[in-house]
Amino acid sequence: MSNVTTIEKLDSILQEDKWTRIVVNNYSLAKIKELDDLINNIIDEGLTEDVLDICGRHLKDVKKSIAGLYISGMLIYSRRPLNDMNLLAVIDLFSQNLKWALVEHICNEMLLISENKHALYTLAKIYAQNNENDKLPGIWTRIVEADIDDTVFVRQLATYYETIDLQKSIFYFRKAIYRFIDKKQMSGIREVWAKLIHYVSDDFDSFLLILQKIEKDLGFKKAIVLYEDLFDHYSLTDNVDETIEILKGILKLDNKNHKARENLVKFLRERYKDVKNIEDYLVKSDIENLDKNFVDVYLDFEKYLFFAKGNFVYHQTWSVGIVRDVNDNGITVDFVSKRGHFIGFDMAMSALSPLSREDIRVLKAVTPKEELADRVKKDIEWAIKVIIKSYKAIDLKGIKKELVPSLMTQSSWNSWSLKAKQILKDNPHFVMDSGKLDCYIYNERSSNLNEKMYDKFKIEKDFYKRYEIFINYCNVKGIVKDLHIEEEMLNYFLIYVNNFTKVDHHVVSSYVILKSLGNFSEELSSKVNIEKDVNLESLLKEYPKGIVDLFDSILNAEIKKELVVLIKEELSNWILYYKELFPHSVNKRLVESLYKEDPREVEKLFNYVIKNYKIYKDAYIWILKHCKAYSIELSYSDSDLLSNLIKILTDSVIKINNKNNSVASKRIYKMVINLLVKDGYLKSVLEVVRDEELAKRVYMTCFYVKDFPPKDLLEIKSIIRQLFDSVEFEDEKMQLAGERMEIGFLTILSSLNKKQKELKYLKEVEIPENSKEIGKARELGDLKENAEYHSAKEKQQFLTKRLNSLMLEIENAKVIDTKDLQSSVVGFGTKVVILNEVTGKDESYLILGPWESNPDEGIISYKSPFGENLLDSREGDSLNFVINNTNFKYFVKKIEPIKFS
C-alpha cells in the first residue's frame, strides 16, 4: 500500500465521521478493527507525524470525531502511554451509548501497550456487568499491581482467595492494610486488621511493625484502638508474654489507661505466679498508680524481680555483680571490684540494672577469657544472639565495641564481622529495629523471611534503601521466595519507569535497576516490561539537568556503576557522556573504554584533571594510581605531581581538625596515605627524581601540620630514609644533639597511642558514666546527706582534671622515629652504661620521655633532674652533679640506641 493510498483512506474515514451521533450508534467492532489495521499501516509506513497533523486539523472542526480521536489517540498512546486523553474520550463516548463490546476491545488494545489503570478499571466493570466472574480475579490482580493506591480490589482479591489459597489471601490482606494506612482509612484498616489477627496470630512481630507505622502515620490514638483489638484476641489464648507486650505497648502510648494497667497486673500475676514475692513487687513498684510514669514503674517492677539472691546486676562504676543476700532494707552485692557492698532498695532501683545469666557482660565476668573468646569466634550466631539480647537492640559498632579488643583483635574482627553480617541478613530471628537506625533486635519467634522483607520494604520510605532491601531479597539463598512479594518489589521500580510525568534520578535509577536485573535473576529479568519508547537516551534527554548532576543525585554506588555500563551499551554518543563524567565520577571501565576509542582524548582529560587537582581530588588520586597502565604523556613532572598530592593530604588533615566536611576529608586522607605508602607511590617517585630536598620538603610539610597522624608521619620518614640514608630532617635537630630545643616533650608512637586510647575512654566511657551516676544520685534528693552524690561529684572533679591534663600532654607531645635515633651522645632513645665512681658498680639506663619513665625498671625521663644531667655526654666523659644535696660521680662507658621490638 502506497503512502497516498493510506492518506486517502484516512481522509475518507474522517469524512464519514462527520456526524458524530449517527456514527457512534452505527460503529461496530469490525469498523474499530478496520481502524486498527489502518493505524498499523500508518506506523509501518512512518506516517505518524503526518497523520497526527491531519487528525489535529480534523478535530478542530469535529471535536467528537470517533475516528480522529481513536487514530490520533492510539498513535500518541503507543509513543507515550501516559497520554491517553483522546482514547479515554472515545471510551467515554462508547460507554454513554452502551457499546460495551467496543469499549472492551479498545481497553484490550491499550493494555497490549501498557497497563493503563483506566482501561483495567473499565474492564473490571464490564466483566462484573456481564457476570464473567472467571475473568474478575485476573483483572483485579492487574489493577492491584498497576495502581498502588487501589484499596477496593486488593481487599476483594484477599477475600476471594480466603477459601481457595490462604497464603495468597494473607499476602493481599497485608498489601491492603498498608494501602489503607497510606490513605488513613481507619475503617478499612480495622477490617483487614481483624483478618490478619485471625489468620496470622503466630506472627506477633509483623503486628508490631504495622502498629509502629500506624502510630507514626495516624497518631497514637488510632494505634491504641488496634492494640486493644489485638489484646482482645491474645488475652483469650495461652500467649501470656505477647499479651503483656500488647498491654505495655498501650501504656507506653497512654500512660493513664486504667483498664490496661489493671489487665497488666492480672497477667503479670499469671506470668510470675511461681515467684515467691510477686505481690510485694507489684505493690512496691506502684504499677497501678496512674500518676506515675508507666515506663519507670515497670522498670522498677522488673528490677524487683531480678533482685533475688544469685541474680546478676550491673553498676556503671563497679560493673557486674552478683546478689549475695536480700533483706527488708536492701541487697548485698559482690561486684568484681567491690565485694559485700550493701545497697538500699531505693538506691538499687536507680543505680543497678538487672542482667540475665546469658548477658555478655556476665559471661565476661564468670567465664575464662580464652574459653569465651574461643566460643565467640567459632559460634558466631550464638555470639550475635547473646550480645543483641544483652542490649535489647544494638548495631554492628556496638557489637564490635563489646568484642574488640577484649575477646578478639581488630584483624580477627574483620573476617568475623563479614560472616556476622551475612547471618544478620539471612537468619529470620534477627530483625532490624524500626525505631533505631541500623540496630538489630533478636526475635525469639522465627520470622517468615518473605514477610519480614516485605514489611521492611513497605515501611521504608527512602528509594535507595528500598533498592538495597530488594537486592538483598534477590540474593538470599536457601529459601523458597514468595513470587507475589518479589513481583510487588519489582513493580515498585516498574511504576517509576512506565508512569512518570517528569524524569528525575529515581526514574533513571529505576530504569538502570530493571535493566541490570539479569545480573541477579534471569527469571525476574524476564518479567520486566518496560514501555517500548522508554530507553536511556530518551530519559537522559528529558532529565532537566546534566549527567554530572544525575550522578551526584544517585545515592547508590552500584547503580552508578551499572549506569556507566548502560551508557556505553545504549548510547551512540557515549564518549561525550564519559568525557563529562570522568572528573566527577572515577570509574576504571569508563577510562578504559575511552582509552580504547581515543588515547589522546584520555591524555587531555588527565592533564585537565591535574591542572584542576584541587577541584577533582578523587580523579587526581585515581590518575596517579593508574596512569602507568596507559601510554599517556602528562604535561607535569613527577615532582609536581607528588607536591600536589602532599597538598591534598595536608589540606585534608587541616579540614579534619577543623571538622570541615570531615567524613569526606577522612576518606580523601585515607586514599592519599594508602597511595603514598601502601601502593608505594612516594618511593617510586623519589627513586626516579632522586631529589633529597623534595623528599625533605614532603616530610616537613606534613610535620608542621597540627595533629598529623604520627604513625603515617613516621612511615613517610622511613620511606625517605631508605632512599636517602644521610638525610637530615629539621625535626631531628630538636632531638638531643648539641642544639636541643624545647617543643613540649618527646615520646614514641606506642606511648602516644596508649594516651590517645586513654583519652578516648575517658571521653566516651568514664565521663558519660559519671554524669549518669550524678543524675541518678541527684534524683534521690537530700544532697547534703547523699554519699553517692558527693562521691560522684568528687570523681567528676578528678576526671575533668585528668581530661584537661591529658589533652594538654597529647597536644605538646612530639613523636620521634625510633629508626632514626642518634647514639653519639646521650639523648632521647639511647641506652647508656655508666660507672658509679662512688660504689664502683656499673649502672645501665634507658633514656626516654615522661610517658615512658619507670625508674624501677631503669627507664629515665630525659626531662628528669637525673636525665638532664646525663644529656649530651659522650663515651669517656666524667660527670659530677648534685641533686637534692646528694653528690653523683659517673664515668660514661657506653652509649647505644635502644632496640625497640
UniProtKB/Swiss-Prot annotation:
Q: Which InterPro entries match?
A: GreA/GreB_C_sf, TF_GreA/GreB_CS, TPR-like_helical_dom_sf, Tscrpt_elong_fac_GreA, Tscrpt_elong_fac_GreA/B, Tscrpt_elong_fac_GreA/B_C, Tscrpt_elong_fac_GreA/B_fam, Tscrpt_elong_fac_GreA/B_N
Listed A to Z, the keywords are:
Coiled coil, DNA-binding, Transcription, Transcription regulation
Q: Cross-referenced Gene3D superfamilies, in alphabetical order?
A: Tetratricopeptide repeat domain, Transcription elongation factor, GreA/GreB, C-terminal domain, Transcription elongation factor, GreA/GreB, N-terminal domain
Pfam annotation, one family: GreA_GreB
**What PROSITE patterns does this protein map onto?**
GREAB_1, GREAB_2
Residues covered by the GRAD1 domain: 171-681
Coiled-coil blocks: 784-815
Question: Tell me, which GO biological process terms does this entry list?
Answer: DNA-templated transcription elongation; regulation of DNA-templated transcription elongation
The residues forming the signal peptide are: none
Region annotation (GREA) ranges: 741-901
Q: Where is the GRAD2 domain?
A: 20-170
This protein's superkingdom?
Answer: Bacteria
Listed GO MF terms: DNA binding; RNA polymerase binding
Q: What does the protein in this record do?
A: Necessary for efficient RNA polymerase transcription elongation past template-encoded arresting sites. The arresting sites in DNA have the property of trapping a certain fraction of elongating RNA polymerases that pass through, resulting in locked ternary complexes. Cleavage of the nascent transcript by cleavage factors such as GreA or GreB allows the resumption of elongation from the new 3'terminus. GreA releases sequences of 2 to 3 nucleotides.
Q: Which family does it belong to?
A: Belongs to the GreA/GreB family.
Could you tell me what this protein is called?
Transcription elongation factor GreA
Its source organism is Borreliella burgdorferi (strain ATCC 35210 / DSM 4680 / CIP 102532 / B31) (Borrelia burgdorferi)
- Point out the gene that encodes the protein: greA
